[in-house]
């Protein structure tokens, strides 16, 4: 901010200047002196404070003008004022010049001042209230003691008949829309009018013009008008000076999220401009600046309480839908069914969208991230989710091809973790990628850049390209430990499956049949003995376990986990024609987590004493922790199409109680 400026005096004339409270005026009395002048004296008004500065030493000046000072090239005056003027040019500083012997001034110079107060204010201390002239308002710092205002992307839709998000136009249709915006106040105080030629201007830079918008509310006789004054094509706005003590209220909206090449910081400035002469540009004599950070999009991990469970209604999933409904009824959340007219035959609701939220001190709301997958569910997030206090954002590649890894079964987030002393209070984003140097499939760069730019959930890339579908939710999930703030990582494990089957074979259950009661599948009599004797299947799953262990090591390193934090769930895979893995039986780790209630794919494992040994094993691992296991039959409606329970459902969860601005990325 411009807090000091120079005013040039001229002997024998009167110079008028507008002074802004909180700044300094400097003037060179030596250069303004008439020929022959040797000393000078000063007089000033009651509310003006003047210092004579010589060789870096300052001396306060009394108001009566009796004291004399020698003129020298190093002598300057520093002028400040204590309060706003009541009339234009009513405060003054008079410099009297004297020759070597005279007691009567040979000439004088006058500085006539109009003091005004200008302050552009925001909620820099993040308490939900716009305070006055916070000294930290022009900077932004992270942490619990941090300072700096916060802005929401206005990505919801308050008016149902509009086709797009509120931030996509330059209009405000209701007061509800203003509540999504951050308030900014321009406070002024001074005489009824300013000297001729002065202007107060709000402005933004060209680089910020597509990232922030500002509205002003007028109150004409016939109701309020919401006027768009800054953003997009509008870079500046002249503010009418009203005189006296005034507060002009503005509403600021974010237009886009942090992303590659955009840190999330935007600046808004107010300047006082001075008129010199016709055809001469106005000169800024004072500038005040505020900085906002646009709130990041934040994902919610499994440990947070569920709000809504989403599932698609298909021609072939009636029983699955019924079982999911029964599971949801055990919790405090609601079931939302996406019917066929909207899903158009697309059952993979997990792959189409990811729920998250944005938050500022004054407000927060959920925001859905729409994947570039764009299956037949592509209209669902805009038609059914986007609305009042429910935002929407998407990222689509311009030139890259979209692969299965761009579906959001390949996008998860861990619970809060601490890694080598570094805390991630909102967890870390987890995405699947290709094996290093393999040149395989990878999530498109535009989505990866977006996730990284949010800063608060630093992404970790895992290796998922070894799977046919290639999603991280095929080999991992997080579950809470009820009654604590702790969690466990569940990982698919082929070695755990072979170990369990060998134990059952040793106990005399080698002829136990898998897929019992499933018609054609059970007629093949797939037994424990056949699985253990299938050498090619054994070798394939040794390779798949190496892929799982690669991810296990990454997760332990990047999330600060130990073996005690991980539970292995039995899984088997078979290799497809591209040498990638698909589940041999329903993959139990691909579950839905609703607090302590887990909806787990029913594995149809070997029947030992008329019970599925896989279900018994998993219950024995999880239920002693306080978790409740419900096994859901998804084999015909999802498993045979290479997905499971998690792939066919989606959960919106409550936001973190932790405020993202309190962390240090």
From Swiss-Prot:
Keywords: Calcium, Cytoplasm, Hydrolase, Metal-binding
Residues forming the catalytic site: 647 (nucleophile)
Location(s), subcellular: Cytoplasm
GO terms of biological process kind: cellular response to leukemia inhibitory factor; chromatin remodeling; estrogen receptor signaling pathway; negative regulation of chemokine-mediated signaling pathway; negative regulation of lymphocyte chemotaxis; substantia nigra development; transcription initiation-coupled chromatin remodeling
Listed result of changing residue 374 to A: Reduced enzyme activity
Residues that coordinate or bind Ca(2+) 5: 354, 408, 411-412
Pfam families recorded: PAD, PAD_M, PAD_N
Predominant place of localization: cytoplasm
Expression tissues: Detected in keratinocytes in epidermis (at protein level).
Single GO cellular component term: cytosol
Annotated consequence of substituting residue 647 to A: Loss of enzyme activity
Binding site for Ca(2+) 4: 166, 169, 171
Reaction catalysis annotation: L-arginyl-[protein] + H2O = L-citrullyl-[protein] + NH4(+)
Gene3D superfamilies in UniProt: L-arginine/glycine Amidinotransferase, Chain A, Protein-arginine deiminase, central domain, Protein-arginine deiminase, N-terminal domain
Domain of life: Eukaryota
Subunit structure: Homodimer.
Family according to the record: Belongs to the protein arginine deiminase family.
Listed name of the protein: Protein-arginine deiminase type-2
Organism: Homo sapiens (Human)
């Amino acid at each position: 901010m411009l807090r000091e400026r120079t005013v040039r005096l001229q002997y024998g004339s009167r110079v008028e200047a507008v002074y802004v409270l909180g700044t300094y005026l400097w003037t060179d009395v030596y250069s303004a002196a008439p020929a022959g002048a040797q000393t000078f004296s000063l007089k000033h008004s009651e509310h003006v404070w003047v210092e004579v500065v010589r060789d870096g030493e300052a001396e306060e000046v009394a108001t009566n003008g009796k004291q004399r000072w020698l003129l020298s090239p190093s002598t300057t005056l520093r002028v400040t004022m204590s309060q706003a003027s009541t009339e234009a040019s009513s405060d003054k500083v008079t410099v009297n010049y004297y020759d070597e012997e005279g007691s009567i001034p040979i000439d004088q110079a006058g500085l006539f001042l109009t003091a005004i107060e200008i302050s552009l204010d925001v909620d820099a201390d993040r308490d939900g209230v716009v305070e006055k002239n916070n000294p930290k308002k022009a900077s932004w710092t992270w942490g619990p003691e941090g300072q700096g205002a916060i802005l929401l992307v206005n990505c919801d839709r308050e008016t149902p008949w509009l086709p797009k998000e509120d931030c996509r136009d330059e209009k405000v249709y209701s007061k509800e829309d203003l509540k999504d915006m951050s308030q900014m106040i321009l406070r002024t105080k001074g005489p009824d009018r300013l000297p001729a030629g002065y202007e107060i201007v709000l402005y933004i830079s060209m680089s910020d013009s597509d990232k922030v918008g500002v509205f002003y509310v007028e109150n004409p006789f016939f109701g309020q008008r919401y006027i768009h004054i800054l953003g997009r094509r509008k870079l500046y706005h002249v503010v009418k000076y009203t005189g006296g003590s005034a507060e002009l209220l503005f509403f600021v909206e974010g237009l886009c999220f942090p992303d590659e090449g955009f840190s999330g910081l935007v600046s808004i400035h107010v300047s006082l401009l001075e008129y010199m002469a016709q055809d001469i540009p106005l000169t800024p004599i004072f500038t005040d600046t505020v900085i906002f950070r646009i709130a990041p999009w934040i994902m919610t991990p499994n440990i947070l309480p569920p709000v809504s469970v989403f599932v698609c209604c298909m021609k072939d999933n009636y029983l699955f839908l019924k079982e999911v409904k029964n599971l949801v009824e055990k919790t405090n959340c609601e079931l939302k069914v996406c019917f066929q007219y909207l899903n158009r035959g697309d059952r993979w609701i997990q792959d189409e969208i990811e729920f998250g939220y944005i938050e500022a001190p004054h407000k927060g709301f959920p925001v859905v991230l729409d994947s570039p997958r764009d299956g037949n569910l592509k209209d669902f997030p805009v038609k059914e989710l986007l609305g009042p206090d429910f935002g929407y954002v998407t990222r689509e590649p311009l030139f890259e091809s979209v692969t299965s890894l761009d579906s959001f079964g390949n996008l998860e987030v861990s619970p809060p973790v601490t890694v080598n002393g570094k805390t991630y209070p909102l967890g870390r984003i987890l995405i699947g990628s290709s094996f290093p140097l393999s040149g395989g499939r990878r999530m498109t760069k535009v989505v990866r850049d977006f996730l990284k730019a949010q800063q608060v959930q630093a992404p970790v890339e895992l290796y998922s390209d070894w799977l046919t579908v290639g999603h991280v939710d095929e080999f991992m999930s997080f579950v809470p430990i009820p009654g604590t703030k702790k969690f466990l990582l569940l990982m698919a494990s082929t070695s755990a499956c072979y170990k369990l089957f060998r134990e059952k074979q040793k106990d005399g259950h080698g002829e136990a049949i898998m897929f019992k009661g499933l018609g054609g599948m059970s007629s093949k009599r797939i037994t424990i003995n056949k699985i253990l004797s299938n050498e090619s299947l054994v070798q394939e799953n040794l390779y798949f376990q190496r892929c799982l262990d690669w991810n296990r090591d990454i997760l332990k390193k990047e999330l600060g986990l130990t073996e005690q934090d991980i539970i292995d769930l039995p899984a088997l895979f078979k290799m497809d024609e591209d040498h990638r893995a698909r589940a041999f039986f329903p993959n139990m780790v691909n579950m839905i987590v609703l607090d302590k209630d887990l909806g787990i794919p029913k594995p149809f494992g070997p029947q030992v004493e008329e019970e599925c040994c896989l279900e018994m094993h998993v219950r024995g691992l999880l239920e002693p922790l306080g978790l409740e296991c419900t096994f859901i039959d998804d084999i015909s409606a999802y498993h045979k199409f290479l997905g499971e329970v998690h792939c066919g459902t989606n959960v919106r969860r409550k936001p973190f109680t932790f405020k993202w601005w309190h962390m240090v990325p």
